[in-house]
Amino acid sequence: KTEFKFGTESRDYYSFEAPGGEMIYYFMFGKDYKEIMGHYIGLTGKPIMPPKWALGFAQCRGMLTREDLTREIATGYRKRGIPCDIIYQDIGWTQNLQDFEWRKGNYKNPKQMLADLKSQGFKVVVSQDPVISQSNKKQWQEADSLGYFVTDSTTGKTYDMPWPWGGNCGVVDFTKPEVADWWGAYQQKPINDGISGFWTDMGEPAWSNEEDVDRLVMKHHLGMHNEIHNVYGLTWDKVVKEQFEKRNPNRRVFQMTRAAYAGLQRYTFGWTGDSGNCDDVTQGWAQMANQIPVLLSAGLGLIPFTTTDISGYCGDIKDYSAMAELYTRWVQMGAFNPLSRIHHEGNNAVEPWLFGEEAEQNVKKAIELKYSLIPYIYTYAREAHDAGLPIMRPMFLEYPYDMETLDTDAQFMFGKELLIAPVVKKNAKTKNLYLPEGNWLNYNDKRTLYSGEQWLTVDAPLSCIPMFVKQGSIIPTCLLYTSDAADDKA
């Protein structure tokens, strides 16, 4: 626990204190933000390079844990010609936490399902949690006998962790070196079946709402939990990535997580977690708007490959027509996240065709726009890998000496050439935005040219997202496909 004392003890100085002895400070400076980020990447490491298919669209929901539903969603996308590359399986896909076995009764023939989806051009990403359920007796006893669990310092026994699903669990101690190969062998099982990556969830480690349980008594191989907590997720991410590469040479890893630490970009991608209005899902406008600065901050923190949960995740959808406008605007904004995943909690379906014909067509248009820009996005993905610069950039990163760009968190640069200004207000049909120096072409009509260094209001019907390209830019695009198998190696 860190204590900050800003003027409470003296007006002459501010101070803070933390347990654990002396701290090491890193002071980074430079002529601009890009130079400072270069110093940070030198300290914490280069981001992993994603496979090309990771830059497309993904579909998920909390109860997407059945073969028949997965096939139904895949067919729905291909039937309607809406591009999509990835279908996720949430935590219920596995028989027990965390044995990496397909749930009996939910999956008739998972290997055949994965082969069929691959032939349709889909990748499948599955969830994993960093725990072993006590109801999973065989694996739990194995890990317990090997000493692979975090222990309770008050008893010396395996720490009994309440978990939101699967019952009480043992927390896997990824700070112990021997755990890596053991976990890697388990996670390789669905990879051998044909899955393409992992979604590492609940890595804080999260738990149930039992406030009387004190996790600070947890003892890891490398120390007590108050010392390990912030880096626990990172130790897990490291094992998942390194074991994937060890057992699957010449394949790029796909891992997406919400819990990590400085340096996570070496192992994983990120997502922002639950972000909607849980009380009224149709009123999540402010929450959606807030995702823009959250994602921009992630990019500045050297997490260049991120996504929001498109739709907001939180809350039951009781009226799809009432949510259609918000859903459309969320997809439009999410199309310009480096990664793009539509996801909602429970069994709330969030496929585009459920929100009405107009929403389906507008969403399809937004997704097709992203796919047409894949060559452009992939180019900047490589720059993110090499230099750590985000694809989704705050305005001041490209225009550091323009004071107007310092407070423009409702728009952003997508690479250096494209300016994106998502509509984040209900019933809005216009968008107020700022154009920095230079001349800017309206990307939607390819005709209207505006001079820079001015604020202006542009039309923003529900069918489009305000988007501008700097005059003189070259924007590589590609033809769309919705049924061919994607490139596994790129």
Predicted regions and their residues:
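N-terminal low-complexity segments that are often proline-rich with Ser/Thr-Pro
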Residues: 489-490
